[in-house]
């Protein structure tokens, strides 16, 4: 198992987030993520998992409480600063639940190149990064295809390629196996395992208990009131059938 450093990657203190005209989707959330951890955010649909990941990804900020990344507080002013934003998104990669949201270029090659060019890398470096990542993910045959014509599994691989080409320290995945066939799910699980062994910090979300112990060492459980009710080793948490039933993650038929 990968050892964790004492370096704090993300820290939320008493964070609250509310979308317009709605009840809070995050209530008084305090949570710390250490470098090298593999953490899964667990909870029923609508509990606030995706919103939390978007805060970690620098796409949203809590309206109350504080959020720090890499031991520095993150503010709206900082995120609106171009140099800060570029540096942040070089360190933190986000894979949306729906790959179509982040695929918008005319070819797979252009899709992978986009973020690298935004970072100011020269064309030779970009080409080298693209070659390396398509070989790593075994998608060389897709390089000239249009992303919108790909299958769901292929789109997920291209979305991963566009993020991993940036070589982020932190990889965040929202419902990573959603819509994937069993073979692609296993491929993704093995990939996340190897990235974790390489020292990446990996944060994911799911409501799939068959998946969580395979992609995380630590699980953070939300209830339907949008609060954290448990934060402990994954294998211990998924043994707590009564708690999982109480948060509507499993039904009465669930057996440990």
Language model regions located:
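H-loop/switch region of ABC-family ATPase nucleotide-binding domains
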Residues: 206-207
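Helix-to-loop junction immediately C-terminal to a conserved catalytic motif
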Residues: 57
């Amino acid at each position: 198992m990968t050892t964790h450093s004492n370096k704090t990657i993300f820290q939320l203190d008493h964070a609250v987030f509310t979308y317009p005209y709605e009840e809070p989707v995050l209530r008084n959330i305090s949570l710390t993520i250490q470098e090298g951890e593999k953490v899964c955010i667990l909870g029923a649909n609508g509990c606030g998992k995706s919103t939390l990941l978007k805060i970690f990804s620098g796409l949203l900020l809590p309206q109350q409480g504080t959020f720090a990344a890499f031991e520095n507080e993150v503010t709206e002013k900082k995120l609106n600063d171009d140099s800060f934003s570029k540096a942040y998104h070089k360190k933190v990669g986000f894979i949306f639940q729906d790959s179509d949201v982040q695929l918008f270029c005319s070819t797979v090659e252009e899709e992978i190149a986009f973020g690298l060019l935004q970072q100011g890398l020269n064309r030779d470096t970009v080409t080298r990064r693209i070659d390396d990542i398509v070989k790593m993910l075994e998608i060389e045959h897709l390089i000239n295809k249009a992303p919108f014509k790909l299958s769901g599994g292929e789109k997920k691989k291209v979305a991963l390629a566009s993020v991993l080409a940036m070589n982020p320290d932190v990889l965040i995945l929202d419902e990573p196996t959603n819509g994937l066939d069993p073979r692609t799910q296993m491929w993704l699980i093995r990939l996340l395992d190897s990235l974790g062994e390489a020292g990446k910090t990996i944060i994911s979300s799911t409501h799939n208990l068959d998946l969580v112990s395979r992609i995380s060492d630590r699980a953070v459980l939300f209830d339907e009131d949008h609060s954290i009710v448990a934060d402990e080793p994954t294998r211990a948490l998924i043994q707590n059938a009564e708690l999982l039933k109480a948060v509507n993650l499993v039904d009465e038929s669930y057996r440990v």
